[in-house]
Amino acid sequence: MEFESVIGLEVHAELLTNTKIYCGCTTEFGGKPNTHVCPVCLGLPGSLPQLNKRVLELGIKAGLALNCKITKVGRMDRKNYFYPDCPKNYQITQDELPICRDGYIDIELESGEVKRIGIERIHIEEDAGKLLHTKRGTLVDFNRAGVPLIEVVSKPDIRTPEEATLYLTKLRSILSSAQISDCKMEEGSLRCDGNISIRERGTEPFGIRSEIKNMNSFKALEKALNYEFDRQVEAVTNGEALSVETRRWDETNNKTIVMRSKEQANDYRYFPEGDLVTLNVSDEWIEEIRKTIPELPYQKADRFVKEYGLPKYDAHVLTLTDAMADYFDECAKLSGDPKAASNWIMGDISRLMKEESTWVEDLKFSPKELAELIEVIKDGTISSAIGKKVLEDMFAEGKSPKTIIDEKGLKQNNDEDAIRQLVNKVLDENPQVIEQYKSGRTRILGFAVGQVMKETKGQANPGIVNKLVTEEVEKR
């Protein structure tokens, strides 16, 4: 029997607001424990929430960016549960009337096929506090309590861990590019839970699902889903009964561990939040918000393919971050050579950034100066080999290409008479070049070219050197 996985993701993203969802406390990351708090986010008696309009705006913006229908009349609800990091013993969230429904994200599979992953709903809610487990006991920090979130719930359309990674990668790029969330997984501003079950391939009914928590990176997401698929297949194959449960990914031991049996919706006793008014969203406001959505990464990638003729892979890599996409876009326009701009950014510049653990935002030279480097190589001022050395100096010092070329005397030698003299010198010192060439081993010319380039410290024009080496060998 062959099994397939059925996967749905629940993604929490902290919203880019200055203050919390129901009070005026800062949402700034960090700070001393329990200093970004007030009676409202601590749930003290007599305190009343007031919804931050910016939270609703960003929730609608997320829905529009993810092709959702926007709920015109909605409400907030109480989700009741008892846990130390939940100061009110309930969370103000949305149950029956989420702000957005029925969206989708298209992902491109390795085969080139485009697959649509449905989005069931997006709702706004408040974050909980944070528990810190120490040898002396468990401490609670309420700085995060009340920080606004959206939860993006996908439909169970994902079939492999690889598809899950593609979906989450694209979701993160959209939310980040649209300035909805900074999506920093390392700071907890993007968190992902996965629901996975198995079924016989080709059948419709869903199996018994497990919810997986603590998947704090893309690598952890794939490893956890792969492990859980194998665990469930092994259990079913051995005749064991699966149960609905919540499990967590143990990064140290590379396995999922049972936390508790999975709660059902009625366990939370949802009911409308009486301290907040009904949410009314007008068509005019929706259109105002729509106008604030910038060109999204996948739209940029499509434009780079159509406008610049880039391969899909290059366009995808260049749009992984807004900063890289914008840097390339400007350089491509200024240089008039998008492919060269793409090659430099994806090649040597990416290598240098990786070696120094820096980002495009940290580059000391502008797109205009990279375009200048492309131009001086194209017009023969320097060779491509020298261009790589110039780029390294630009990366380290932030000087313009022309300044570096002038200071170091790197201009390419295009003097045919001078180069011809060097060619003859190399051929005189290496008579085997002539012998081997005349016996049919034409590759030996590459050796002669290399020797001439060595004599000129790479500054001779390679095209001229190649031409003159061939001419002089033919004469002898």
Curated annotation (Swiss-Prot):
TM stretches of this protein: none
Top-level taxon of the source organism: Bacteria
Protein name: Aspartyl/glutamyl-tRNA(Asn/Gln) amidotransferase subunit B
Gene Ontology terms, MF aspect: asparaginyl-tRNA synthase (glutamine-hydrolyzing) activity; ATP binding; glutaminyl-tRNA synthase (glutamine-hydrolyzing) activity
Reactions accelerated catalytically: L-glutamyl-tRNA(Gln) + L-glutamine + ATP + H2O = L-glutaminyl-tRNA(Gln) + L-glutamate + ADP + phosphate + H(+); L-aspartyl-tRNA(Asn) + L-glutamine + ATP + H2O = L-asparaginyl-tRNA(Asn) + L-glutamate + ADP + phosphate + 2 H(+)
Enzyme class: ligase
GO BP: any one term: translation
PANTHER family xrefs: GLUTAMYL-TRNA GLN AMIDOTRANSFERASE SUBUNIT B MITOCHONDRIAL AND PROKARYOTIC PET112-RELATED, GLUTAMYL-TRNA(GLN) AMIDOTRANSFERASE SUBUNIT B, MITOCHONDRIAL
Keywords tagged on the record: ATP-binding, Ligase, Nucleotide-binding, Protein biosynthesis
Subunit structure: Heterotrimer of A, B and C subunits.
SMART domains noted in UniProt: GatB_Yqey
Function: Allows the formation of correctly charged Asn-tRNA(Asn) or Gln-tRNA(Gln) through the transamidation of misacylated Asp-tRNA(Asn) or Glu-tRNA(Gln) in organisms which lack either or both of asparaginyl-tRNA or glutaminyl-tRNA synthetases. The reaction takes place in the presence of glutamine and ATP through an activated phospho-Asp-tRNA(Asn) or phospho-Glu-tRNA(Gln).
Family of this protein: Belongs to the GatB/GatE family. GatB subfamily.
Gene3D superfamilies with a match to the protein in the record: 1.10.10.410, GatB domain, N-terminal subdomain
Pfam families the record matches: GatB_N (PF02934), GatB_Yqey (PF02637)
EC number assigned by the record: 6.3.5.-
NCBIfam families, sorted: gatB (TIGR00133), PRK05477.1-2 (NF004012), PRK05477.1-4 (NF004014)
